Amino acid sequence: MSMSITQPIKDLLSSQFQSYNISEQVKLYDIFPLLKPSCIKEAITDVVEVCTGYGPESLDPSIRAKAAVKLSLCEFEAVGLSIIPQGCYSNSIEEMMDCMLEIEHSSHWWTTYSGNYQRLSDVCSTYREYYQEKAIIETFLNITDFMADFHNQFKSSVVSETQEFQSNMKDKFAGVYNQFTHFESLLSQMIQKHSGIINDSIVAIKNKLSTEFVDELQMLKNDRYILINQILESDTEIKKTIDSMLVELTEDMKNQISAKSEFLINHMNITRLNESTALHDIIEENLQERFKDIAIFLDKFMVEIQTETNKVLLEVNEKLPTLEQQYLGNFAQALSNIDKQVLSASLQWQYDYDVVFANLYAALDLLNSNLNSSVKKIEQIEHVIDTIIVDTSFLNDQLANLILIPSTILRAFSFIGVKRVIIAIIVLYFKSTLLCLVHYGQSFRIAALLMSATAGIFCSKLLMSYIYN
């Protein structure tokens, strides 16, 4: 392709025109006018060869004179001058000198020669530029040929490399597809081989979880029953302790009254011996009245203490069953909710695992998503277990509140006077005894008895100080 474009131009530049027809030459001459053959071109051939290599300053005078003569002859031929010296057509130096002598005799000839001789410098510069352009054109044509060849080679190389790359990629993709198919087959075989083991493992896990849940619930129920029994035993023990305190307080008060009565009787006998009978009668009458008042007051005081104590015990006995039933009902409801959540979670977990292992045979890309779903369900079960733990702690708090209910009820009473103070002390003892029994169990009974004795002595002292004052 490139040779069909640039080769005629190269041949034309080297003056090889014989292999081309007239129309091609005319076409090329129209594109490059400087390539047209002429008399002037032939006359300055030697000058141009020197100029293109070294410039106008390097022209030899003989070459310059010879070229000026030839240019003059071209002008003479162009104007149709028939008388031209014959020596001017020769290339020898001697005949050329004869030509110049003949030209010198004619002013017209000499003027033409002199003008051509002087203009050779300009002609040399002009043709030097032309030949430089010619060299540039040749260089351009060479580069064009090189680029055309390079383009063709590059195109063929790219096509070949692309085809080879496509072929290699097809082979590689085919190998990857075969490996993937083989891997899928192995995975299916492995799933079929181990499906029984996996199902057995799932069943074992579900059974283990169910057993653990049942055991945990049973432990919670046992703890609940033990705590309720402890509360009931503590209630009974408190009642017995209060009754014992009342009996001891009554006996102590009777003993104090008897001692005081004996002291008064002795004092009255001594007074009768030392004073007059009338005065003794008055004193005896006053003492008897005072003694009756004290006895009446003590009887009323004991009745009031017994009445207030019975009221407190009745209120406690009335409220405790209601609160126990309420909190036990809440506890049973919470346990029922826990059972339902555990059962629901177990059924849901079993269903999800069945779905996962059923979908494993569908496609390999669904395996990852199904496993993620299973992980989420396990997290839900863990959340349910956490909820069970929270509910258990809530039940413990409710039971602790149940223990503190008697103290809360009794604290609401506001008594005024010595009798109320004594009952308040009994209430405080009731509270401390109940709490200690809950926290320390049966080992606290001895300490409770010691506390009851201390409380009885303190109440007796308060009562005696009230009587004497």
Curated annotation (Swiss-Prot):
It is found in: Endoplasmic reticulum membrane; Nucleus membrane. Keywords: Endoplasmic reticulum, Glycoprotein, Karyogamy, Membrane, Nucleus, Signal, Transmembrane, Transmembrane helix. GO terms for biological process: karyogamy involved in conjugation with cellular fusion; nuclear membrane fusion involved in karyogamy. It is a multi-pass membrane protein. Glycans are attached at residues 21, 142, 199, 269, 274, 372. The chain crosses the membrane at residues 421-441, 446-466. Residues 442-445 are cytoplasmic. One of its GO terms (cellular component) is nuclear membrane. It comes from the Eukaryota. Residues 467-469 are lumenal. The keyword Transmembrane applies. It holds the Pfam family Tht1. Required for nuclear membrane fusion during karyogamy. Belongs to the KAR5 family. This is Nuclear fusion protein KAR5. It comes from Candida glabrata (strain ATCC 2001 / BCRC 20586 / JCM 3761 / NBRC 0622 / NRRL Y-65 / CBS 138).
